[in-house]
């Protein structure tokens, strides 16, 4: 019987103390929140359970009890049975840290009464007072209790942040901030990055009262961090729509203070989220809209990166921002738009800049235009590239390497295809005597295939080009690549098939990929049968054909509607007496927008 009892004790000890290897918690950990927790804890210990047994992350039952805000009697029992009140888990957190984090006023007070050290530090250097500073809503009471038991109100964590700094970084903690200051917190202590509590409050708080509280208790409104930012710089980057900027300026913040890279608060606001309100406020208080930083970048340059670029640009331009200002690399705001990652469509931003005189052909120090820059952007936006072209960007402009935007786009077949649709030159070389086709073969065969389709089409549209030395060189390059030979043959098949479909003695279906004369095409478009527009009919030039035919049909519809409307509303006998062909010729001199206005305004 004695042997059995001893064996039973050994087995139970193994069970109680090792069950956590299979499960996260031991029975002792689970017991702390049961109604009869004290009795169960005593029973487990009497059966051989280790009072200091740990679960995952090296937490004891006391850690669990503190985190789950167990009754003071449970905490007292665990400690009286042998748990160290300042025991730490794998994160070096004590039970007191957990009690404070969980907003546990009663548990916190009990642990302190039982000897918990209010200045013990978590692995990141934070004391329970740091934790209390971030607790809502009982932060002020927790702070008072901890300081009453000896907590250092200016304790520093591993980043040199005080409890006041952590409170300032959160919203809705002004009462906690007031309590900390009342108990001796220093408002001027900087962390390792030179950041003061006022910097943090200016950037994070939606309540300007927090900012005012810190200033009224001695915070330096123009204090600079290691990057040279003042609290006003930080407020300008904040997403919050608050009165913080006005509050800082009211208390003496320098609106044109420059940080270590030369950015003013207006620079920061320009590139921030939700910038419009902040820009207007700063400008109203004297911010220089044409201030330049260390590389001559203005707020207008940076506004192109905002999530509301168009509105930000509009505010700056309305207040005198120079739309063609250049940085030290010769880049204008239009260049910056070409590299913007804004989630907003940038077409309206381009329209706004052009409307106010921005040079869409401006060149940077290496001769690159906004178009060439956009074509060399790994996160390219086809709509933006097309917008540049539609607003007059020269598709064949050359940089100092004698390269056109096509060279910049070689790695991106979608961009190459777009440039081909606008007839970018292919029979050219750069200063290294390399053609776009040769560059594409070396970098992206998909782009090479697209370029071949344009080379063959150009030869069809402009027969004289066949005598050009670079064209001959391109054709030789094609013949040396089996894959490109197949593309060439497919191109020629499409062209010959279109040529075989005749409308009359002069024109066939091929005119729609050969000519850009929209009036000529609109006069012939009624001959085009829908079967020719089906996706499988022309594998190479089908898209180009469809685009041309649809544009011609739209043009014809506008012409017909305009003639009909003018015939119905005019009392001029001369107009009605004109032959229909002459009416077409007269209206054909108008653009699509003019015809659309006739239809819209006279209907």
From Swiss-Prot:
Q: Where is the signal peptide?
A: none
Could you tell me the keywords of this UniProt record?
Answer: ANK repeat, Repeat
Q: Which domain of life does the UniProt lineage start with? A: Viruses
- SUPFAM superfamilies, A to Z: Ankyrin repeat (SSF48403), Pseudo ankyrin repeat-like (SSF140860)
In its keyword annotation, does this UniProt entry include Cell cycle?
A: no
> Which windows of the sequence hold ANK repeats?
23-53, 57-87, 91-120, 124-155, 159-189, 193-223, 227-257, 261-291, 295-325, 329-362, 366-397, 401-428, 432-467, 504-533
Query: What InterPro entries has UniProt attached to this entry?
Result: Ankyrin_rpt, Ankyrin_rpt-contain_sf, Multifunctional_regulatory, PRANC_domain
- What is this protein's record name? Putative ankyrin repeat protein FPV162
Organism of this sequence: Fowlpox virus (strain NVSL) (FPV)
């Amino acid at each position: 019987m004695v042997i059995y009892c001893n064996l039973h004790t050994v087995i139970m000890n193994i069970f109680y103390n090792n069950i956590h290897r299979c499960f996260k918690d031991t029975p002792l950990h689970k017991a702390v929140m049961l109604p009869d927790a004290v009795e169960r804890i005593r029973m487990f210990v009497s059966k051989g359970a280790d009072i200091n047994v740990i679960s995952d992350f090296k937490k004891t039952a006391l850690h669990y009890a503190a985190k789950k805000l167990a009754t003071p009697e449970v905490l007292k029992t665990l400690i009286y049975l042998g748990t160290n009140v300042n025991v730490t888990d794998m994160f070096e957190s004590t039970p007191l840290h957990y009690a404070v984090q969980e907003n546990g006023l009663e548990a916190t007070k009990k642990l302190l009464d039982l000897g918990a050290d209010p200045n013990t530090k978590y692995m990141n250097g934070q004391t329970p007072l740091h934790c209390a500073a971030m607790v809502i809503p009982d932060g002020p009471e927790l702070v008072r209790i901890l300081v009453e038991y000896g907590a250092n109100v200016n304790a520093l964590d591993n980043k040199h942040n005080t409890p006041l700094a952590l409170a300032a970084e959160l919203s809705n903690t002004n009462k906690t901030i007031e309590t900390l200051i009342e108990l001796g917190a220093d408002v001027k202590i900087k962390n390792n990055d030179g950041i003061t509590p006022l910097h943090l409050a200016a950037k994070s708080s939606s309540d300007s009262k927090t900012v005012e509280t810190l200033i009224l208790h001695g915070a330096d409104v123009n204090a600079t961090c290691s990057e040279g930012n003042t609290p006003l710089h930080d407020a300008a980057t904040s997403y919050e729509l608050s009165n913080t900027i006005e509050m800082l300026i009211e208390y003496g913040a320098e609106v044109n203070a420059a940080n270590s890279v030369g950015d003013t608060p207006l620079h920061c606001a320009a590139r921030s989220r939700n910038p419009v309100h902040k820009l207007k406020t700063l400008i109203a208080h004297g911010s220089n809209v044409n201030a330049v930083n260390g590389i001559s970048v203005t707020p207008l340059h940076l506004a192109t990166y905002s999530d509301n670029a168009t509105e930000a640009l509009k505010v700056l331009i309305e207040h005198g921002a120079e739309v063609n200002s250049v940085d030290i690399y010769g880049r204008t705001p239009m260049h910056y738009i070409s590299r913007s990652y804004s989630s907003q469509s940038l077409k309206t931003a381009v329209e706004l800049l052009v409307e106010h005189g921005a040079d869409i052909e401006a060149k940077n120090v290496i001769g690159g235009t906004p178009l060439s820059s956009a074509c060399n952007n790994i996160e390219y936006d086809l709509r933006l590239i097309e917008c540049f072209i539609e607003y007059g960007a020269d598709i064949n402009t050359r940089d100092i390497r004698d390269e056109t935007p096509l060279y910049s786009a070689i790695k991106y077949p979608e961009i190459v295809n777009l440039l081909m649709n606008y007839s970018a030159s292919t029979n050219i070389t750069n200063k290294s005597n390399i053609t776009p086709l040769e560059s594409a073969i070396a970098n992206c065969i998909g782009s090479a295939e697209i370029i071949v389709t344009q080379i063959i089409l150009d030869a069809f549209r402009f027969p004289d080009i066949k005598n050009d030395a670079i064209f001959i060189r391109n054709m030789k390059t094609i013949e040396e690549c089996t894959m490109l030979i197949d593309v060439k043959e497919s191109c020629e098949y499409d062209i010959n098939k279109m040529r075989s479909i005749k409308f009359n003695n002069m024109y066939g279906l091929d005119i729609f990929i050969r000519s850009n004369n929209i009036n000529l095409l609109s006069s012939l478009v009624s001959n085009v049968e829908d079967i020719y527009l089906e996706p499988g009919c022309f594998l190479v030039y089908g898209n180009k054909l469809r685009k041309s035919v649809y544009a011609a049909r739209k043009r014809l519809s506008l012409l017909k509607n305009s003639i009909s409307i003018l015939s119905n509303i005019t009392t001029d006998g001369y107009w009605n007496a004109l032959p229909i062909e002459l009416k077409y010729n007269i209206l054909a001199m108008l653009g699509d927008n003019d015809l659309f206005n006739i239809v819209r305004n006279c209907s």
